[in-house]
Amino acid sequence: MDLNTLISQYGYAALVIGSLAEGETVTLLGGVAAHQGLLKFPLVVLSVALGGMIGDQVLYLCGRRFGGKLLRRFSKHQDKIERAQKLIQRHPYLFVIGTRFMYGFRVIGPTLIGASQLPPKIFLPLNILGAFAWALIFTTIGYAGGQVIAPWLHNLDQHLKHWVWLILVVVLVVGVRWWLKRRGKKKPDHQA
């Protein structure tokens, strides 16, 4: 079974799972796969939006349920948390939709929104809207980028095994060096 067959068979499920938390890379790759004809563009957008929406909904509910307890654990970031909570109070609609576009806020954003006690009837439709906007934008970028890397992708199957072997050799060399270094540090302790 080649890589293209795997992508065609399991691509949509991988997109849903991959976009549950961060997901920009997965979404871009979904767009590339759509450009290559391995996946259908509308289904890529739908899969990515679904994964992003589910992930953010779970984080929102965790924030709503455990928000105070969770946020107290990040005492050194209290000023940033308070600033974000003020933004949520002033511009809840923009914050809910925009949090998925803010670097570093994709996971903590929905949790903060839940902790702010924004009602679910407001969060859910905004979450759906934001998820579809985010999915459409990043899938489109991936689709456009697919043209740039298309020539390289056609030879990916031929070169994939070489990359896998290279990675395995690097991991093996690093592992052996670490083991020898650790073994060398233990030796003097046994002689003393």
Curated annotation (Swiss-Prot):
Protein localization: Cell inner membrane
GO BP, sorted A to Z: FtsZ-dependent cytokinesis
Topology class, membrane: Multi-pass membrane protein
GO CC, any one term: plasma membrane
Family annotation (Pfam families): VTT_dom
Similarity comment: Belongs to the DedA family.
Name of the protein in its database record: Inner membrane protein YohD
Organism: Escherichia coli (strain K12)
Lineage: Bacteria, Pseudomonadati, Pseudomonadota, Gammaproteobacteria, Enterobacterales
